[in-house]
Amino acid sequence: TWAIVKADRAPDWPITSRPKLRWPNDARVALWVVPNIEHYGYLPMPQRARNPWPRTPHPDVLNYGIRDYGNRVGVWRMIDVLDKHGIKGTVSLNMANYVHYPEIFQACAARAWTILCHGLYNTRYHWNYSEEEERAAIKECIDIHGELMGTMLPGWFSPAVSFTLNTPDLVAEAGIKYYCDWYHDAQPLPLRTNHGPLV
């Protein structure tokens, strides 16, 4: 059951009984700015778990257009605001944006923003993937990022938060250091995997 898996991965540790967390420069608060920059397939492959575009007939131009607006307009407005305030972001990026919107990742790279993998497409869910299918999907993202950026992906956030019970193990096995699918705490905490801890 989920409760057993959760207890095995992230044992309960009330925030009131933990040692005080010390941030750099004795800051009282840490703010992590992580915009999701996603790409939704216009006519995505059929999915086992749910239809990415429930409105029929396909293509669902209305819902696709709302999401595509973010990559054409919204992201640039957000970058302007972050630049104005001197804020460096970590981008939760669907790797398909490297192909479809190269200007986006070029803008992120020019600002030395960290790129956190958000899967390939936000309409390519991992729910119901076999272990091998999910391992291959993670490797594909690592390979795309490595080829274009020359670095290893530091973190993982499954597309549409479509993680499986295997995801933490597969992410750690692939050499990724932190994992963002679980919203289970207010502080970064270790998550147990078969390949060492993730944060």
PLM feature segments, named:
Residues 2-155, 160-199:
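Catalytic alpha-helical scaffold of carbohydrate-active enzymes acting on polysaccharides/glycoconjugates
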